[in-house]
């Protein structure tokens, strides 16, 4: 029989891999954004997005922009496709992180 602890760690690994995919897709989106919409790139602080002096309020703007699907009116189909992919990965990663937390609580109660 499969150990519940091993199953929990496998779930954690899947969650971390999906976080890495999300991070990579976000970096690729910012590269596309720099070329197709420089004003939006500046609006979300694309140049300083992943630096230590990045502005969290501008980072949250980009997440809100994608989550509210405001990108659907954009003129560049490549940008729309990448935003759709990123939105799906964000929802998947959020659900997996929630599942990890629920699993951790269940393991704490179980043992």
Swiss-Prot record:
GO cellular component, one term: plasma membrane
Keyword presence, Nuclease: no
Coiled coil (residue ranges): none
TM spans (from-to): 1-21, 90-110
UniProt keyword terms in alphabetical order: Cell inner membrane, Cell membrane, Membrane, Transmembrane, Transmembrane helix
Principal location: membrane
Cell location: Cell inner membrane
Record has Membrane as a keyword: yes
Membrane topology: Multi-pass membrane protein
Record NCBIfam families: PRK04960.1
Family note: Belongs to the universal stress protein B family.
UniProt-recorded name of the protein: Universal stress protein B
Organism from which the protein derives: Yersinia pestis
Gene name tied to this protein: uspB
């Amino acid at each position: 029989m499969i150990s519940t602890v091993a199953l929990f760690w496998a779930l954690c690994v899947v969650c971390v891999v999906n976080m890495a995919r999300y991070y990579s897709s976000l970096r690729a989106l910012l590269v596309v954004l720099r070329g197709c919409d420089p004003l939006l790139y500046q609006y979300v602080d694309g140049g300083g997005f992943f630096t230590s002096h990045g502005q969290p309020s501008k980072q949250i703007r980009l997440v809100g922009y994608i989550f509210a699907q405001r990108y659907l009116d954009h003129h560049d189909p490549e940008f729309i496709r990448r935003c759709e992919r990123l939105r799906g990965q964000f929802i998947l990663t959020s659900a997996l992180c929630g599942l990890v937390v629920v699993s951790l609580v269940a393991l704490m109660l179980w043992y």
